[in-house]
Amino acid sequence: MPKAPKKITKPKKAEKKKNPLFQAKPRSFRVGGDIQPKRDLTRFVRWPRYITLQRQKRVLLQRLKVPPQIHQFTKTLDKNQSSNLFKLLASYAPEKPAEKKQRLVAQAEAKKDGKQVETKKPIVLKYGLNHITTLIENKQAKLVVIAHDVDPIELVIFLPQLCRKNDVPFAFVKGKAALGKLVNKKTATAVALTEVRNEDKAKLQQFSELFKTNYNANDELRKTWGGGILGQKSQHKVEALAKAVQEEQIKKAKL
């Protein structure tokens, strides 16, 4: 008799060992399920230390009452005025080391050839707090520009009053780094112009009048206190308390 055919057996697949630490969790794709809408999580970000300090300082200056002498530093020139001012100041930036080397080499070669070398004192921006203070006291400065974010503020807090006393036009601009860039430094507390070229005298006069109107002769700037703004939570508490008092008064009036 013929033998019965052998049963075809499928080879058993080796079961993969599953790690018990990783468990399958089915996701719900409904509204408000596992996939949440994007939210602004700025408040919960762990910022770098220096940014945290910047944020805390900003909030503190809003909460506390800030004296006018410090608060006036927040009243900077607007974007249009400051851009025009920086264009003028950039044309009087001191020479860079490479430019100085090139100039000295050219002078040395001219001297070697027996040519007469003319050396005129260049008209450049003045910087350095002590130097600017001396220029203001001697009434040599025609225009003074002060950075609004000097830290500690005590370094320059006397400059505005000194400028008013000596009738020197001054203004606050955003960024000690921007002023530093003009004089080839990382930062600068203030810069000053003592003289300008003939073609820029009209611009200097224009800026002098603007600064005197907005800063030197502006008495509100010297009297206005800053800060004293409550936070969102405190504002809600004050409103709730005022509402409760109002309701209590209405009840008493009805009695």
Swiss-Prot record:
Q: Keyword Ribosomal protein, does the record have it?
A: yes
Q: Does the keyword Zinc-finger apply?
A: no
Q: Which family does it belong to?
A: Belongs to the eukaryotic ribosomal protein eL8 family.
Q: Which Pfam families match?
A: Ribosomal_L7Ae (PF01248)
Cite the record's Basic residues compositional bias ranges: 1-16
- A GO MF label: RNA binding
Provide this UniProt record's keywords sorted from A to Z: Ribonucleoprotein, Ribosomal protein
Disordered: where is this region? 1-28
Organism's domain of life? Eukaryota
Question: What would be one Gene Ontology cellular-component term for the protein?
Answer: ribosome
Q: Which PROSITE patterns match?
A: RIBOSOMAL_L7AE
Return the Gene3D superfamilies for the record: 3.30.1330.30
Q: Which GO terms describe its biological process?
A: ribosome biogenesis
**Name recorded for this polypeptide:** Large ribosomal subunit protein eL8
